[in-house]
A protein has these predicted regions:
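Soluble extracytoplasmic regions of secretory-pathway and membrane proteins
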Residues: 1-732, 736-776, 780-783, 789-800
Length: 801
């Protein structure tokens, strides 16, 4: 009986196993094909039936063999046994022969002699199933595609109808300007910023502005006096965020900050309830012990001011209390530190903060979610919040194309950044951005919000963990305004859409209209040979179908294959503005728009646009002059924008001197439209060059046209004028949008001395002389001006200290 049951179970398993063919990876598509449906699956049912019959035969044989008389002569019993074995032997042998014929020979013969010669016709039904399922599983079934007949001839005034989009073109490259943030806003060597700052949007003076933003995190590697007390009880947190306009720079090429300084001042933190302290962040230390007895002096370092600095005591609920000896012993063992057990800094009010990375905290709360590779800060309702996107995934969606999420989300940013990563490598054929998570930078509290309420997977997890999730209605308007379309999901979708924009099974089979994401042309030749893809970019622009400019995530396509002729075939964007209403996602959020260029289009792709820049004699000459001195040229992200009836390429060019304390400054902007190239000190001027002398719209840096001197804000804000990090432990004067000094509680009076003002004026004049000499190619004068600049900056630093 046991043998029969096992045989029946195996047969049943074979029947149930046919469903695995629906997610089987084939050479062309995922899912069952003609041969699978017409040979493999029927054969499976036949073999299951044969196996069941065989089980019955064996069962009957076993029962019959037990009826042999035990008292019969041995010879008689042997003869009977031999006869009895004939039936099962023949049955098993027959089953093996039938199995070989049906499961091996028949599918192979069918595929080779019937399917392969007529593959396009015979596989079309199953390819169509794959197309439809893939689009549904990856959220591509509602893509708004349109033909975009792009011109390559730039005409005067062509951008007049795109004035708002033109004004918002982002100049600051989030991958390049982190060193600039550090030098101008780090304040002290024990603070740092992410190596790739975030792009977000904020309402500034009633106008939505693309913004580059970063949190000032703690970095103990920059602390001179390292010991257990300092590392774990004194230097416990970072302080504030720094934000700059994405589309504007100062005349000197520095970011134009609207939230800066320490203590933080600016447009984002004018609320009295603002909490700037950052105890939880991606770069936070392994653990900190916070809390002090009532009535005692605070010992946590808060921010630099005066000769000693301000102090603070943590007042939140961010970690376990370790006031009793047993808790101290446990954590001393966990972290391998006897100081936790014996230090007087550990008291009855002490808490220990650990697992401080926002992504790590969300993973602890919801380990079943796949988390986005980027965590970004936002100032929400007076607090700094880290926003983490969570995905539900599956590899069991019938007929949907399987994708390696890790490979699909790699690009030049993830390859070069320590703070942005691709998704963990795993196969999936269904993905939804079903969860938005926030982590409070002060107390580490984690809030999970159900974002995609139609996702059945997250509905199941809600039932398993009741009360773990907040509903959409609980998202405040301020938080909603910073919920953006996540990059990792978009990168997965753009990889699939490169093929699955094709809706016809016959066209899909031919593969003639397949696309690919271009490699990043700003990377080294070696990186381009490794097919390091161009990342998507957040931009505010107006695309086909949208009535006004929208904060969007964008990418582009070129033809698939290895052809050296790189033309643009498509422009992809998704509306990333979730609106600002409490509990309500903006109606256009998540709308994916695909602008397909005609097959005979000759609009250059990103790689060709970069080649056009490199081939321009004027551009090459000036860049070579810049690089021949003591400076390095860094080319920023190459942005693609559907403007002026065609595609505009914009690339900021940064210059960085070779000194150890130097930082990138935006000095030039490259623009291309068709084969026309513009190259100027400002984006506004470069656009005019490719559009007949007048583009018809003003860029964000239009006010800098004709102005090569440092502006008033930079002359007043010493931390954005000296370009160096103060490392002596004394207070830097913070900058703010009003150009005033402030935030000093120590020896500074808050006003600028005449000597300091003169030193800064001398620095500004030296920068002006440097620019003038550089344009003339007079490198002797340029060297003299740089020397004068260094002397003026050193004098300014000395006076400030």
């Amino acid at each position: 009986i046991w043998l029969m049951l096992n045989i029946f179970a195996w047969a049943a398993n074979q029947v149930l196993g046919v469903f695995s063919h629906l997610t089987e990876e084939g050479s062309r598509i995922t899912g069952a094909t003609y041969t699978t449906v017409n040979a493999t699956i029927p054969v499976t049912f036949i073999m299951a039936a044969i196996t069941a019959i065989l089980g019955v035969i064996l069962g009957l044989w076993i029962m019959k063999s037990h009826t042999l008389e035990g008292s019969a002569p041995i010879a008689a019993r042997a003869s009977e046994a031999l006869k009895a074995w004939k039936v099962p032997t023949v049955a098993i042998a027959s089953a093996i022969v039938v199995s070989l014929v049906l499961t091996v020979a028949w599918p192979v013969l069918l595929q080779r002699f019937r399917v392969n010669p007529n593959a396009q016709e015979m596989e079309s039904t199953y390819i169509q199933r794959n197309i439809d399922a893939t689009r549904a599983a990856y959220g591509l079934d509602k893509v708004k595609a349109e033909q975009y007949k792009a011109t390559t001839e730039g005409e005067e005034g062509a951008l007049a109808d795109s004035a708002e989009s033109t004004a918002q073109i982002r100049l600051l490259d989030p991958q390049i300007i982190s060193p600039t943030f550090k030098q101008l806003q780090q304040s002290k060597q024990y603070y740092t910023f992410a190596d790739t700052v975030a792009v977000d949007k904020y309402d500034v003076d009633g106008v939505s502005q693309d913004t580059v933003i970063a949190a000032r995190e703690l970095d103990l590697d920059g602390l001179d006096n390292r010991n257990w007390v300092n590392d774990h009880t004194v230097y416990t947190h970072g302080y504030g965020v720094v934000a700059a306009y994405g589309n504007q720079v100062t005349a000197a090429g520095q970011p134009k900050f609207f939230e800066a300084g320490i203590p933080t001042q600016g447009k984002l933190t004018d609320s009295e309830k603002y909490e700037p302290r950052i105890y939880f962040s991606p770069n936070a230390t392994e653990y900190s012990i916070v809390g002090a007895p009532e009535g005692t002096k605070s010992w946590e370092f808060d921010y630099p001011t005066g000769s000693e600095g301000a102090t603070n005591t943590f007042k939140g609920d961010g970690g376990p209390k370790i006031g009793n000896i047993f808790s101290r012993l446990l954590y001393a063992i966990r972290f391998g530190s006897d100081q936790i057990l014996f230090s007087n800094r550990v008291n009855s009010n002490s808490q220990i903060l650990y697992d401080r990375s926002p992504k790590e905290r969300v993973a602890k709360v919801a380990p079943y979610l796949t988390l986005d590779g980027r965590v970004y800060p936002a100032v929400v309702d007076g607090r700094v919040k880290w926003i983490v996107d969570g995905y539900t995934t599956s590899d069991a969606y019938p007929y949907s194309q399987m994708t390696d999420l890790g490979e699909a989300t790699k690009d030049s940013t993830t390859e070069s950044s320590d703070t942005v990563s691709s998704l963990n490598s795993k196969n999936a054929n269904y993905i939804r951005n079903s969860v938005k998570a926030t982590v409070d930078a002060y107390d580490g509290s984690v809030d999970l919000y159900v974002w995609d309420q139609s996702d059945p997977v997250i509905k199941a997890w809600e039932k398993i963990f009741p009360g773990q999730y907040h509903q959409l209605s609980e998202i405040s308007g301020d938080l909603m305004s910073h919920m953006r379309y996540p990059e990792s999901l978009f990168k997965v979708q753009r990889e699939l859409l490169a093929k699955y924009h094709v809706s016809s099974a016959n066209q899909f089979f031919s593969g003639e209209d397949f696309w690919q994401t271009p490699v990043d042309p700003t990377e080294s030749q070696q990186a381009q040979q490794r097919d390091i893809l161009q990342p998507p970019y957040y931009l505010t622009l107006q695309t086909g179908g949208s009535s006004e400019p929208v904060f969007s995530l964008t990418s582009s396509y070129i033809p698939a294959g290895s052809s050296t002729r790189e033309i643009l075939t498509g422009f992809l964007s998704v509306d990333s503005d979730a609106g600002h209403e409490k509990g309500k996602i903006g109606s256009s959020y998540g709308t994916i728009r695909l602008q397909e260029l005609p097959k005979d289009s000759n609009v250059p792709g990103p790689g060709q646009a970069q080649n056009n820049f490199n081939a321009s004699a004027d551009v090459s000459k000036e860049l070579n002059l810049l690089e021949s001195g003591s400076t390095n040229v860094q080319r920023g992200n190459l942005l693609t924008l559907p403007l002026g009836g065609g595609l505009v390429y914009v690339q900021p060019v940064y210059v960085k001197s070779s000194g150890s304390t130097s930082f990138p400054l935006l000095k030039k902007v490259l623009v291309a439209f068709g084969d026309q190239v513009g190259f100027a000190d400002t984006l506004d001027e470069a656009l005019d060059q490719v559009f007949g002398g007048d583009s018809g719209a003003s860029a964000g840096d239009a006010e800098n046209v004709g102005d090569t001197t440092d502006d008033k804000q930079d002359a007043k804000n010493d931390d954005s004028a000296d370009g160096k990090t103060n490392t002596d432990g004394k207070q830097d004067t913070p900058s703010n949008t009003d150009g005033k000094t402030g935030g000093n509680n120590g020896d500074s009076s808050g006003t600028m001395s005449a000597d300091l003002k003169k030193a800064l004026d001398d620095a500004a004049q030296a920068m002006k002389d440097s620019d003038a000499a550089m344009k003339k190619g007079d490198w002797s004068a340029y060297g003299d001006a740089q020397k004068q600049l260094q002397e003026a900056l050193n004098k300014a630093i000395e006076l400030e200290q």
